Amino acid sequence: MNKLLRLIVDNKADKPRPFNLARNGDAASLYIYDVISADWGVSALSVIEAINQAGDVQTLNVHLNSPGGDVFEGRAIMAALAAFRGKTVAHIDSLCASAATSIALACNEIRMAEGAFFMIHNASGFAWGDKTELRNTADVLEKIEGAIVNDYTSRTGKPEQEIRDKMQAETWFTAQEALDYGFVDSI
């Protein structure tokens, strides 16, 4: 089992965690400090409920410290943030890896703390079944990867193959490297 997956499994909660939304005038903050999953950790539904609780705030601060998780939950959170009527600001407080990167990229602005990390890698998953089912799973992973590559190239302006090479290598960016590469706006 790869190290990131082991970290996710070892730190999973028994069920999705509820959010405490912190409001301060025209701004609200939510903290995605866990694995992204419909079954445990942070679910898309819990984030959507928190966004709805924010009401008509002008700025939504999204604090991230997540090893990632379920790509589809991450993309649902991404869509919810993109639909938010105000400004969204991602704050990468420690770790923004895998599916959590989609959440950061959905925000209008991305700030990263000194000492934090941003990790990208190829889509991965589990498969069970005969050879046809395994091949079908690989085909789906390639489609998922294509969507993620598109997100990363749109954000950074880097060529597709360069992004694919970084994902293949499972690249960990420091805050300065993520800034230089175009993933974040400021440190």
Predicted feature locations:
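N-terminal organellar transit peptides
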Residues: 1-101, 107-187
